[in-house]
Amino acid sequence: LLKLFSGRQFSEFFTYPGLEKIQNRNSVCISVKVEHNVGSSMYDVCSMEYWESAIEYITRTVENPLFFICSDNVEYVLRNLIDATKYDYVVQDKNVPVYVSLAVMSECKHFIIGNTTFGWWAQYMSQNPNKIVVAPSKWMAVDMPIDLYENNWHLIEV
């Protein structure tokens, strides 16, 4: 499955803005779904404190990170989560198909994911054996067994 979905099969992959930076730096994909299931408290897990803790952990652990911001609301992320004066970043190109963005996300070295499958798939598709994945300790606000976590992930209590 991973070989079938390599980004290299899509022409848009090679011209994706910031791809070279993402491939050659300590890139960290931060996948934030701002409008995540609006009206459903079951998925209301990742607070502002979660994102702040996740970013702080990455900046302590990864030297000179380049954040690749993937979100349904990039402006919100830049205004509230990533200090654009302090960190280098690249933003998701909304003019290319989402499957190309997913392939580019998987090129990142490390990942901060929320409780969405989009970020989960990006880290899963990553070929970096030394990747750091930061995730919320719960996937849903209700107690329900979820088998999505890897043993080596850094979980932040939510």
Language model region names:
Residues 52-54, 95-98, 152-153:
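Short amphipathic alpha-helical segments, especially helix-boundary/capping motifs
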Residues 32-34, 138, 158:
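Active-site donor-binding loop signature of nucleotide-sugar glycosyltransferases
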Residues 29, 89, 133, 153-155:
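Conserved beta-strand scaffold positions in the cores of enzyme catalytic domains, especially
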Residues 1-62:
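Secretory-pathway luminal glycosyltransferase catalytic domains
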Residues 6, 11-15, 68, 119, ...:
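Compositionally biased, low-structure terminal segments
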Residues 141-158:
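Leloir-type glycosyltransferase catalytic cores
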Residues 42, 81, 145-147:
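Short aromatic-enriched loop/helix-cap "lid" or pocket-rim segments at secondary-structure transitions
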